[in-house]
Structure formats: structure tokens, C-alpha cells
């Protein structure tokens, strides 16, 4: 069911100050702050301070993203955590898709600072199962063919069932191949960190996700040592924060944060 609130009009990062419980919201690969603002606004209404960040190389141009490493994306997320701490007493990190990988790294490396995790459509593995095998070849392709294969255009837009949201989302129209290499490296790095993540975790994923298969849920249930609660959506695709179930997602996240990150039940 579509949300009762209008979709965001701004693509800027924003700190929405409210109560002393806080949420850091981290968007996905080739995404932008817009995809997390709707959730941030709903959390703010629930008296939760929300910091919607923009990752390095995102929300500007594909060329900007091309020169950025995954460590730079993590640096953006870490800076967002630092900023949010100035206004809150406890923090839950909410990451979508690739942002979920960064959230896992934040939790593993900052256990005293991150109270809990919400992973929206996490991208530990993607529907393009051969990508990890192909990624090491990408630098050779770029050297051999130059600009011809520098960017890969997205076909059909973002993986969103809601037509209005799919039309409105201002994500990149093409993906830099160099950035794909960085994504694969981040996936491997995040997978190695899973045994270190002991915070309560809420995983929200759609059974209709065409980008990151529902298999991601099973991986997290098996490999995270801390408590994990899952919610499987039926009407949304990949970008669940703005898709047909966006109000349900917002309510579940707000409840999780307000409970202090309790995942059991």
C-alpha cells in the first residue's frame, strides 16, 4: 500500500533533530539521500533524531562516483555517526542495500557507539551472481577499451514497484564500472565482519527484490551472532524505504529504535 505522506522533494542530506534517540540513515549504491529522507521524516515525527547522509561520489554525477573508493563511502558514514552523536544518547544505524554493508562495518568497528542495526534490502550478494568473478577483470576491460565501457546504463530505472517513487527517485542513470569493483570489495569485506556484529538487528527485505535476492536474509540469520528479527515484504521491490510498503517499513524501524534496538520477538 502506498504511503499516506508525499514523497520527498529534496535530495540534500539532512539532520532532523528531535529526541535523544538517533538514527543514522545510509543510502545505497548509485543512490542518494532522497531514498532515505521519507524514512527520516517519519522517524522525526516519532521523536527520533535522524541524520540522512550522502556518501562520497553520490548525489552529484557518475563521474564523481568513478574516482571514489569504498573506504570513502565508509568515511562518509562514519562522519555521519560522529555528527549524530552530538545530539543523541544512543544510535541505531539504518542502511539500505550497499548502505547496509556500511552499517555492518560501523557496528563491527564501533560496538560501543552503535546500539542496533536496521538492514533494508542488504546487498551482501546481488542477483548478478557472477559479479564477484567478473570484477577482477574490469580494470583490464577499461584499459583495453577506454571510455567505451566506462559506464553501464541502467535499464528500466530503479528497482521500485511504486510508479511514482520510481519516476521521482534521482539516482544515477548509469553505473561506473570502476565503482562496481569497489562494491564487490566492500561486499567481501562486510561478509568477513559478520561474526563481529553482536548488536540487535532488524532485517527488512522483499521477496520481490530483483536486485538483491532474499538469500541475503538467510546469510544474516546464519552468520550474525547477535539477535536478528526479520520482516519479509510482499508488495515492494528493492528500494523498500520509498516503495509500496514504505509506511510499514517506517513504522517497524521507529518501533525498533524506540524500543532501544530490541530485535527479539
Q: What does each model-found stretch correspond to?
A:
Residues 218, 222-239:
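Catalytic histidine neighborhood in serine/cysteine hydrolases
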Residues 234-265:
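Catalytic active-site module of serine/aspartate enzymes centered on a nucleophile-bearing elbow/loop
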Residues 118-127:
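Active-site nucleophile loop of the alpha/beta-hydrolase fold
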Residues 176-193:
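Active-site nucleophile elbow and catalytic-triad environment of alpha/beta-hydrolase enzymes
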Residues 197, 203-205, 209:
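Short beta-strand/loop motif that positions the catalytic acidic residue
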Residues 210-216:
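Conserved alpha/beta-hydrolase "acid-adjacent" motif
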Residues 95-99, 103:
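Gly/Ala-rich beta-loop-alpha elbow adjacent to hydrolase catalytic centers
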Residues 43-62:
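Conserved alpha/beta-hydrolase
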Amino acid at each position: 500500500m502506498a504511503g499516506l505522506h508525499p514523497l520527498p522533494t529534496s535530495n540534500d542530506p539532512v539532520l532532523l533533530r528531535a529526541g535523544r534517540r538517533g538514527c543514522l540513515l545510509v543510502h545505497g549504491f548509485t543512490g542518494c539521500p532522497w531514498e532515505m529522507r521519507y524514512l527520516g521524516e517519519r522517524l522525526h515525527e516519532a521523536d527520533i533524531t535522524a541524520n540522512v547522509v550522502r556518501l562520497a561520489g553520490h548525489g552529484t554525477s557518475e563521474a564523481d562516483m568513478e574516482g571514489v573508493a569504498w573506504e570513502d563511502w565508509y568515511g562518509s558514514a562514519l562522519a555521519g555517526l560522529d555528527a549524530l552523536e552530538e545530539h543523541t544518547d544512543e544510535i541505531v544505524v539504518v542502511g539500505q542495500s550497499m548502505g547496509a554493508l556500511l552499517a555492518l562495518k560501523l557496528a563491527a568497528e564501533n560496538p560501543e557507539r552503535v546500539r542496533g542495526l536496521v538492514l533494508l534490502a542488504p546487498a551482501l550478494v546481488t542477483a548478478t551472481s557472477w559479479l564477484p568473478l567478473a570484477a577482477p577483470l574490469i580494470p583490464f576491460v577499461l584499459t583495453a577499451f577506454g571510455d567505451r565501457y566506462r559506464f553501464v546504463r541502467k535499464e528500466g530505472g530503479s528497482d521500485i514497484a511504486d510508479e511514482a517513487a520510481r519516476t521521482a527517485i534521482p539516482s544515477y542513470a548509469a553505473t561506473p564500472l570502476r565503482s562496481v569493483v569497489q562494491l564487490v570489495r566492500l561486499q567481501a569485506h562486510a561478509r568477513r565482519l559478520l561474526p563481529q556484529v553482536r548488536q540487535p538487528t532488524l532485517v527488512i527485505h522483499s521477496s520481490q527484490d530483483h536486485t538483491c535476492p532474499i538469500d541475503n536474509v538467510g546469510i544474516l540469520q546464519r552468520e550474525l551472532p547477535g539477535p536478528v528479527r526479520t520482516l519479509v515484504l510482499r508488495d515492494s521491490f528493492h528500494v523498500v524505504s520509498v516503495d509500496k510498503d514504505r509506511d510499514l517499513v517506517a513504522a517497524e524501524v521507529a518501533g525498533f529504535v524506540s524500543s532501544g534496538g530490541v530485535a527479539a520477538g
